[in-house]
Amino acid sequence: MAVDPLSSKALKVKRELSENTPHLSDEALMGLSVRELNRNLRGLSAEEVTRLKQRRRTLKNRGYAASCRVKRVCQKEELQKQKSELEREVDKLARENAAMRLELDALRGKCEALQGFARSVAAARGPAALVAPASVITIVKSAPGPAPAADPAPCS
């Protein structure tokens, strides 16, 4: 098997170019501006220039991907925190709503009892002494809280 002297010479030249390639660390390669990189790559073969530029692009993309992952994790944690806070608020509002419903039911019961009482008093006095339901409702004492409405409405 004969070795072509021309091809071995080309291989030797290629190895020499590789040996003359500036040894840049990954950090240095990424840290260079494009202008500085091009200045450092002057005199190298097109293949070496392409290889180094591709390596730089790969390293930069890797860094961008890592920072994107970190950002996504931080956003996810923040959203989970907000979700927990909102769930606590929903639970609190549900408890308040249930308490208000119980209070409303109790007030409805009192209102109906008073209306029944007013009807029985009116029936005992006769048709001439009918008491309007609104006048009965206005005499009901309510628990301290918001001021009673000036024009009370029926219980339903």
UniProtKB/Swiss-Prot annotation:
GO terms for cellular component: mitochondrion; nucleoplasm; RNA polymerase II transcription regulator complex. The keyword Metal-binding does not apply. It is found in: Nucleus. Keywords: DNA-binding, Nucleus, Repressor, Transcription, Transcription regulation. It comes from the Eukaryota. GO terms for biological process: in utero embryonic development; regulation of epidermal cell differentiation; skeletal muscle cell differentiation. GO terms for molecular function: DNA-binding transcription activator activity, RNA polymerase II-specific; sequence-specific double-stranded DNA binding. Residues 51-114 form the bZIP domain. Monomer and homo- or heterodimer. Interacts with MIP. Forms high affinity heterodimers with members of the CNC-bZIP family such as NFE2L1/NRF1. Since they lack a putative transactivation domain, the small Mafs behave as transcriptional repressors when they dimerize among themselves. However, they seem to serve as transcriptional activators by dimerizing with other (usually larger) basic-zipper proteins, such as NFE2L1/NRF1, and recruiting them to specific DNA-binding sites. Interacts with the upstream promoter region of the oxytocin receptor gene. May be a transcriptional enhancer in the up-regulation of the oxytocin receptor gene at parturition. This is Transcription factor MafF. It comes from Mus musculus.
